[in-house]
Amino acid sequence: AGGKATCCPCFMCSYTAGCPWGQCAHHCGCD
C-alpha cells in the first residue's frame, strides 16, 4: 500500500519511459 505518492502523473503514464520512478496505470488511479 504505497499509495499515490510513488505514482507518476497520469499524463506521464501513457508511456513507460516517461515514468522511470514509481508506478503507473490503474495502480495509481490512471487508465
UniProtKB/Swiss-Prot annotation:
GO-annotated cellular components: extracellular region; nematocyst
Native organism taxonomy: Eukaryota, Metazoa, Cnidaria, Anthozoa, Hexacorallia
PTM annotation: Contains 4 disulfide bonds.
Keyword terms, alphabetized: Disulfide bond, Ion channel impairing toxin, Nematocyst, Neurotoxin, Secreted, Toxin, Voltage-gated sodium channel impairing toxin
Family named by the database record: Belongs to the sea anemone short toxin (type III) family.
Record Pfam families: ATX_III
Function per UniProt: Binds specifically to voltage-gated sodium channels (Nav), thereby delaying their inactivation during signal transduction.
Protein name per Swiss-Prot or TrEMBL: Delta-actitoxin-Dar1b
Domain of life the protein comes from: Eukaryota
Organism the protein comes from: Dofleinia armata (Armed anemone)
Subcellular locations according to the entry: Secreted; Nematocyst
Further facts: Da I is found as a major form, whereas Da II is found as a minor form.
Gene Ontology MF terms in the entry: sodium channel inhibitor activity; toxin activity
